Regions:
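A generic structural micro-environment signature
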Residues: 60, 74, 159-160
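A glycine-rich phosphate/pyrophosphate-binding beta-strand-loop-alpha-helix module
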Residues: 69, 73-76, 80-152
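A short glycine/serine-rich beta->alpha loop
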Residues: 61-67
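Active-site-proximal beta-strand elements of phosphoester/diester hydrolases
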Residues: 52-56, 92-95, 155
C-alpha cells in the first residue's frame, strides 16, 4: 500500500487528484464522487458527495503460518473498516506472491511450510471467506519469485467499496 499511497500523494501535490479525500489513513485511499440520489420526499434528484474507498490489508505472517485462516482473515480485515464506516463492499482483488510452488517438498526451508501448501491453502481460505459473504473477486493474480520463499506476500487484498 505504501507504493500506492506515495504515488497518490505525489499526484495530489501535482494537482492531479483533486477528488482524493485527505486523511490520516495509511491502509486506504478514498476519492470523492458526486452521486445523484432520488429522495423519497418527491423533491426530485439531489447531488450528494460519496466516498469510494480503496482498502488494503496484509496478512503475510498469519498466511505463512496457517494459510487458509490467514488469507480468510485478511479478506475479513479488509472489509471490516469500510463496513464500520457505513460503507458497502462490493468487490475485491487478490494479488499475492510466493516462491515456486512446484518445487520439491525436499527443498522447503526448515521451519517453513512448503510453498505449494501456502499457495493452495491461501487461495482456498480467501475464496471460502469471499464465497460465504457473497463478495465478488474481480481479479486474482499470484506472482512467483525465488526471493519470496521466506514469506508469502498477501498484499494487497483490496476490496473496493462505497
Amino acid at each position: 500500500m505504501d507504493i500506492a499511497l506515495m504515488a497518490m500523494k505525489k499526484l495530489r501535490a501535482e494537482g492531479k487528484l483533486d477528488d482524493m479525500e485527505v486523511s490520516d489513513e495509511i491502509n486506504a485511499c478514498s476519492i470523492v464522487v458526486p452521486v445523484e440520489i432520488d429522495h423519497e420526499d418527491g423533491k426530485g434528484p439531489v447531488m450528494e458527495e460519496w466516498l469510494v474507498f480503496f482498502k488494503n490489508e496484509t496478512h503475510n505472517h498469519p498466511t505463512e503460518i496457517e494459510p487458509f485462516g490467514g488469507a480468510a482473515t485478511c479478506l475479513g480485515g479488509a472489509i471490516r473498516d469500510p463496513l464500520s464506516g457505513r460503507g458497502y463492499v462490493y468487490q475485491a482483488m487478490r494479488v499475492t506472491g510466493a516462491a515456486d510452488p512446484t518445487k520439491s517438498l525436499k527443498e522447503t526451508l526448515e521451519g517453513k511450510l512448503p510453498q505449494r501448501k501456502i499457495v493452495t491453502g491461501a487461495a482456498s481460505g480467501y475464496s471460502s471467506y469471499g464465497n460465504q459473504i457473497g463478495l465478488a473477486t474481480g481479479l486474482v493474480d499470484e506472482i512467483y519469485h525465488p526471493n519470496l520463499s521466506l514469506i508469502h506476500i498477501s498484499e494487497p487484498t483490496r476490496p473496493i467499496s462505497i
